[in-house]
Amino acid sequence: MVTFHTNHGDIVIKTFDDKAPETVKNFLDYCREGFYNNTIFHRVINGFMIQGGGFEPGMKQKATKEPIKNEANNGLKNTRGTLAMARTQAPHSATAQFFINVVDNDFLNFSGESLQGWGYCVFAEVVDGMDVVDKIKGVATGRSGMHQDVPKEDVIIESVTVSE
């Protein structure tokens, strides 16, 4: 279990080690190293998802490790409350950023090993704190430099606890 201690409350997450082993290992490594401490949910879209894991307050981007293989063909779906890896348009480009689905997002699911079909790898789910996620999804957002949908007031992951 992983707990994000945010300035809006705690979000408790259960990982799917058996379905996305490389992705879960990558995520837990970042958690244990303290990478996510004092990072923000930098992209919040009500009716879609909340994204974090890559920026500090002030939209300062963090350096990451090498990208990992996309394990989206694991049978898991991007349903409300699941966590998936964020990435660029390249299927195997995920590093540290993740998002929490606030609705079912079927269009993000794996449909085939093509550029459009790879989808986004689900690797965990919220088991407690969806009320916190729902609070976050409703914050006021705007533009920050080249970025859209950025909370006007920082939504901060203050610290992360990993319990085996």
Curated annotation (Swiss-Prot):
Activity regulation comment: Inhibition by cyclosporin A with a Ki of 25 to 50 mu-mol, a concentration 1000-fold higher than that required for eukaryotic PPIases.
Cell location: Cytoplasm
Catalytic activity: [protein]-peptidylproline (omega=180) = [protein]-peptidylproline (omega=0)
Start and end residues of each PPIase cyclophilin-type domain: 1-162
Keyword terms, alphabetized: Cytoplasm, Isomerase, Rotamase
Enzyme class name: isomerase
Keyword Cytoplasm tagged: yes
Entry's Gene Ontology cellular component terms: cytosol
EC number annotated for this UniProt entry: 5.2.1.8
Alphabetical GO biological process terms: chaperone-mediated protein folding
Annotated GO MF terms: peptidyl-prolyl cis-trans isomerase activity
UniProt function note: PPIases accelerate the folding of proteins. It catalyzes the cis-trans isomerization of proline imidic peptide bonds in oligopeptides.
Similarity remark: Belongs to the cyclophilin-type PPIase family.
Protein name listed in UniProt: Peptidyl-prolyl cis-trans isomerase B
Organism from which the protein derives: Escherichia coli (strain K12)
